[in-house]
């Protein structure tokens, strides 16, 4: 029954995407079918097949080791505020977001910059990009951008495509925006992991977002023009660093900007949510609903969707609330509110944890529309009106991609 419900959830999400398509007659069944199959296959390999699960666990172990090295840098600056004594001192509540999550973002961004400098990222992107381009029958630039999102976030995508943005057709531009929204950056992945989100789920979600973003981008905005961009004129950065030290320093400064942005937005939105909840609770109290909140309203509205994705009805309100928070606010706030349930064993079953972890794993939220429009318009001011028109539709495609990954994850966890 649970497995069939997951299948129903996939059908519902695909139906929603089909209904939102701007040109239903131009939908390529070859690309859409291949993307769906690839998204399912990646999920199956990493969540169900023993060899794939073994690899995911080993990579997750490696990520945790990297986080430990990040803590070494944090401890140098903040001392014992990062150490295990904090948990003892505060009875298990010694995890401080600003001392653990934000420094990890800075460290990983610097590390990624070094890997770009020595050519590792370039090789991975070209190999994976070529594979996805052939498998999905998409343009080279679409596969390039989609694969790049494993390592870079939506803020960095405009810089990646700047050298050839004038040659991107409307569909390729839409796909680039969708891919950025549907994914997470490698640096922020560490931040989510630090909150207790299973790393193997984050890794699987990041890989599944590649075909998932393409799938829903091509459903909502089918390709109607041929590509004018080739791999021969692709570049990873406009001004590459001249040394590995410069690469590390530049990456660290970029990480600082990302960390500062995360801290600023999370702090502001947590406070805004508290204000909204105070207002809702106050008004609700007049009618006997003094415990009403934004989270509870979103939970009721999205609970049916969470249920059809595979979440048990007893947890559907919570799942719907977190998905709503991610969409209305951002994924960091949603993961932050999800974190307490991860810290207490047995609070949620494994399938629910997986579905929520996958559903929240992406930049798709209303605030991202402003980020994308601003970032892409900065590198292509003359295309700003076109980019603004694509924003809301791209958000829908990216959200559906995240929910599809979550539904697929629930399907395979249910089989295990």
Curated annotation (Swiss-Prot):
GO terms for biological process: nucleoside transmembrane transport. It is found in: Cell inner membrane. One of its GO terms (molecular function) is symporter activity. InterPro entries: C_nuclsd_transpt (IPR008276), C_nuclsd_transpt_met_bac (IPR018270), CNT_C_dom (IPR011657), CNT_N_dom (IPR002668), Gate_dom (IPR011642). Residues 24-31, 119-172, 218-246, 374-394 are cytoplasmic. Keywords: Cell inner membrane, Cell membrane, Membrane, Transmembrane, Transmembrane helix, Transport. It is a multi-pass membrane protein. Residues 1-2, 53-95, 194-196, 268-352, 416 are periplasmic. The chain crosses the membrane at residues 3-23, 32-52, 96-118, 173-193, 197-217, 247-267, 353-373, 395-415. It holds the Pfam family Nucleos_tra2_N. GO terms for cellular component: plasma membrane. Its main location: membrane. The keyword Transmembrane applies. Belongs to the concentrative nucleoside transporter (CNT) (TC 2.A.41) family. NCBIfam families: nupC. This is Putative nucleoside permease NupX. The gene is nupX.
